[in-house]
């Protein structure tokens, strides 16, 4: 009996340590980004840094305005959600509630494969197929644009949205659906008036995971967006927060390098804000 209690305490201790390691990693990343990012913001000025429209670190009078990057990231993420969320949501409803087991297995494997494709492959296919297609379709000088980034990101967030939404929908108690059907509701009415509302917290989590994937993506976006520090327009080349960091960190020094850490800090705060908003929403729904 004592040996079992000792084993149980040991396991609990190991789990506690692992949990503390996870928390410590988050705290260390936060502290490192704050320490590395604040000096540049202090030197440049918070207003000029966040709302400046010109990014030209190589000029004789360097300018470090990241408003084009912020807006490009927001517009690109929002556009990918507009495209990807409806597709992912309705696909999840179909696979969870309507598809035969064989179709569900086949499409589930395809979704898993889509999730495992490296970002650089998405970017390469987008650069070779999507970018020329946009250039020809809209008669543009260059198809590398915000629109191309939106489409690529929409495809990349589909696996997260579909898989998490399916899990949430599958977890809905069958008794709820049976009761709805017994009252005369059609299967479609039951899905969208009973199953989906019951699973809304899981579906919201799926969307937030998609947002995190979209706003944090760098390689694929850099390959299809043109990576130019312009104010965002749908058919023009743009640069996201992530691509600004990844494209400049290899050779940046001095204030330029510090400014890139500041951009990483802004990106980190964006993710924290999104997660906090989700938690607030879910707590409000539970009340």
List where the protein language model places each region.
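Transmembrane alpha-helical segments of polytopic membrane transport and secretion proteins
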Residues: 1-19, 278-287
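Cytoplasmic-entry segments and transmembrane alpha-helices of multi-pass inner-membrane transporters
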Residues: 12, 87-126
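Transmembrane alpha-helix signature in integral membrane proteins
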Residues: 66-94
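Generic hydrophobic transmembrane alpha-helix motif, especially the helices
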Residues: 112-157
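Glycine/proline-centered hinge or cleavage motifs at structural transition points of membrane proteins
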Residues: 118, 183-184, 197
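Transmembrane alpha-helices
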Residues: 164-165, 187-222
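C-terminal transmembrane helix and the adjacent membrane-cytosol boundary/short C-terminal tail
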Residues: 166-170, 174, 181, 250-287
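Interhelical loop and adjacent transmembrane-helix boundary motif
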Residues: 221-268
């Amino acid at each position: 009996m004592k040996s079992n209690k000792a084993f149980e305490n040991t396991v609990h201790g190991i789990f506690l340590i692992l949990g503390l390691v996870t928390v410590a990693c988050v705290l260390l990343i936060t502290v490192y980004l704050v320490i590395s990012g604040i000096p540049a913001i202090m030197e440049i000025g918070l207003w000029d840094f966040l709302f400046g429209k010109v990014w030209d670190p190589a000029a004789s009078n360097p300018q470090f305005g990241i408003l084009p990057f912020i807006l490009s990231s927001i517009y690109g993420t929002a556009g990918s959600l507009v495209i990807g969320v409806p597709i992912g949501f309705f696909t999840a409803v179909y696979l969870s509630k309507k598809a035969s087991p064989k179709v569900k297995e086949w499409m589930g494997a395809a979704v898993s494969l889509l999730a495992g494709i490296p970002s650089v492959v998405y970017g390469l296919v987008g650069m070779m197929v999507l970018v020329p297609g946009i250039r020809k379709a809209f008669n543009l000088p260059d198809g590398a644009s915000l629109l191309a980034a939106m489409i690529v990101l929409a495809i990349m967030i589909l696996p997260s949205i579909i898989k998490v939404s399916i899990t949430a929908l599958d977890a809905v108690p069958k008794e709820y659906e049976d009761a709805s059907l017994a009252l005369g509701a059609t299967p479609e009415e039951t899905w969208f008036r009973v199953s989906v509302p019951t699973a809304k917290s899981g579906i919201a989590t799926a969307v937030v995971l998609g947002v995190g994937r979209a706003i944090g993506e760098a390689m694929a976006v850099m390959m299809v967006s043109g990576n130019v520090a312009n104010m965002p327009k749908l058919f023009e080349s743009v640069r996201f927060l992530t691509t600004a960091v990844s494209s400049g960190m290899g050779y940046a020094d001095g204030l330029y390098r510090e400014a890139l850490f500041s951009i990483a800090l802004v990106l980190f705060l964006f993710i924290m804000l999104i997660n906090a908003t989700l938690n607030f929403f879910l707590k409000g729904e539970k009340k």
